[in-house]
């Protein structure tokens, strides 16, 4: 695994330097992207959201960072969890978490170094593996209501037709 890491990152050293981040910071941010999406096409867009938020001094507010800091996570992210102070909880801390929360793949590392050029500051799961991206908090809050309502409907449907499958996160606002 270490060998593969250096195979991926050594050719990118110059780009890491140009990014204004250390390799540790690149890998840490890439780990968030790795946990946020499995969609290759979204990685550079999510990178742009996080980088845009960092530039504006906003908290990253990434659910996977909260989950990583919870000792016995039961699959249900609560408002209390969002306010727990850990070195990883980006709802509480400003900037990047203490270190990586996962082993990022090459696509996630490259997404940090070559982010999409967007004005997006927010994203929410569409409950289908992809995300809706927003430029404003107002637009984001509308999207959250839409997709969380759909997610609740899907959870109810799953309760009636099969095993419980969580298709959305617990409301965060």
Model-predicted segments: where are they?
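Bacterial extracytoplasmic/cell-wall-associated proteins, especially those involved in peptidoglycan
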Residues: 1-173
């Amino acid at each position: 695994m270490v060998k593969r890491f250096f195979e991926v990152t050594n050719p990118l050293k110059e780009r890491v330097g140009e990014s204004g981040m250390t390799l540790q910071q690149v890998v840490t941010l890439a780990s968030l992207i790795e946990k946020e999406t499995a969609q290759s096409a979204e990685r550079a867009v999510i990178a742009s959201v996080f980088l845009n938020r960092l530039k504006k001094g906003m908290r990253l507010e990434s659910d996977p960072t909260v989950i990583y800091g919870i000792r016995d996570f039961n699959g249900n992210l609560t408002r209390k969890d969002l306010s727990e102070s850990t070195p990883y909880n980006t709802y509480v801390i400003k900037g990047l978490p203490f270190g990586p929360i996962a082993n990022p793949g090459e696509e996630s590392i490259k997404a940090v170094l070559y982010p999409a050029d967007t004005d997006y500051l927010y994203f929410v799961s569409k409950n289908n593996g992809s995300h809706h991206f927003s430029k404003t908090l107002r637009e984001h809050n509308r999207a959250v209501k839409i997709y969380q309502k759909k997610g609740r409907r899907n959870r109810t449907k799953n309760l009636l037709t099969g095993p419980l499958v969580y298709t959305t996160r617990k409301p965060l606002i």
